[in-house]
């Protein structure tokens, strides 16, 4: 209990309320995978690649902590289909991993990949924004 909030009781109450709603119609296994895929698309190919070979210790603590939080949230099944909103605070910490690319040539290449992915998504997906 910190500042009057019991995390365990809150998790149990949230799970009960969530299961009483539309969550019963959403398959857990599908969202365990698709949430992570959507997060990967949101952060882009450069971030996914940077996380794969991240060795810089201070950055690893930030990005790794955000990644651990995302995995725990995903395994709790409390974020089915809500990744774009619920996990948004983790995105900047994950993107920090791209600052550790070895040299300027790598950074430019991955920046181009990020740009291409963003343009492709914007062309393929219809968005009201």
Summary of predicted features, one role per range:
Residues 1-52:
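Membrane-lumen/periplasm interface segments of specific transmembrane helices
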Residues 1-4, 68, 116:
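Hydrophobic alpha-helical membrane-interfacial segments at the cytosolic entry of transmembrane helices
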Residues 35-44, 82-102:
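Hydrophobic/aromatic-rich transmembrane helices and adjacent perimembrane loops
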Residues 40-63, 67-74:
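Hydrophobic, aromatic-rich transmembrane alpha-helices
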Residues 50-57, 98-111:
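Membrane-interface junctions at the ends of membrane-embedded or membrane-associated helices
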Residues 74-90, 126-129:
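Membrane-interface catalytic loops of GT-C/OST-like multi-pass glycosylation enzymes that act
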Residues 103-127:
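Signature aromatic-anchored transmembrane alpha helix within multi-pass, membrane-resident enzymes
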């Amino acid at each position: 209990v910190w500042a009057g909030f019991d995390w365990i009781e809150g998790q149990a109450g949230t799970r009960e309320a969530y299961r009483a709603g539309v969550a019963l119609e959403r398959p857990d296994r599908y969202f365990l995978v698709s949430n992570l895929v959507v997060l990967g698309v949101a952060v882009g190919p450069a971030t996914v690649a940077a996380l794969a070979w991240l060795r810089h210790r201070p950055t690893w603590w930030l990005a790794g902590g955000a990644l651990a939080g995302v995995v725990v949230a995903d395994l709790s099944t409390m974020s089915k289909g809500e990744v774009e909103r619920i996990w948004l605070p983790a995105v900047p910490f994950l993107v920090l991993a791209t600052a550790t690319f070895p040299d300027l040539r790598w950074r430019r290449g991955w920046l181009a990949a990020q740009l291409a992915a963003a343009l492709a998504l914007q062309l393929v997906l219809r968005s009201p924004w």
